[in-house]
């Protein structure tokens, strides 16, 4: 298993290569390893309440919607809810369905002073396959990481 330092460095290198506006990016298994490493990192799941209920959730994740459902309206209280949930120095791993909303959330968190914001690439459900379906290529669930369904 990689050390937390090696995982942070891997995340940082990806951020530099992709010119990301936040601290880094990790694959789901790397994110889980960092969460288990006891460095105080927290997973922030930014999917909608509907997604959490119908698709599945990660035990122990902080759940703050980036957009609401229905209507996909931006959560105007996202940063305030994040600030209420964790101290600014906490390493945060942002995850959504596929990595787009979590990219935006990590960007906003960084701008709000959460300097250790990391995007979880592939998200919970992964990328679409050739048939346009998720959960077959990458993602938290496909990788076999902990999750539950209502």
Predicted features and spans:
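Short, surface-exposed ligand- or partner-binding patches at beta-edge/loop junctions that are enriched
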Residues: 94-95
């Amino acid at each position: 298993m990689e050390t937390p330092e090696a995982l942070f460095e891997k995340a940082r290198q990806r951020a530099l290569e992709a010119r990301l506006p936040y601290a880094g990016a990790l694959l789901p298994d790397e994110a889980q390893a960092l969460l288990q490493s006891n460095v105080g990192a927290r997973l922030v799941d930014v999917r909608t309440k509907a997604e959490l209920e119908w698709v599945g959730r990660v035990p122990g994740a902080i759940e703050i919607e980036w957009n609401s459902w229905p209507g996909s309206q931006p959560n105007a209280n996202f940063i305030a809810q994040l600030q209420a949930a964790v101290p600014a120095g906490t390493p945060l791993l942002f995850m959504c369905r596929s990595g787009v909303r979590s990219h935006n959330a990590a960007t906003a968190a960084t701008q709000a002073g959460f300097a250790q914001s990391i995007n979880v690439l592939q998200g919970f459900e992964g990328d679409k396959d050739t048939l346009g379906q998720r959960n077959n290529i990458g993602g938290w669930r496909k990788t076999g990481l902990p999750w539950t369904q209502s």
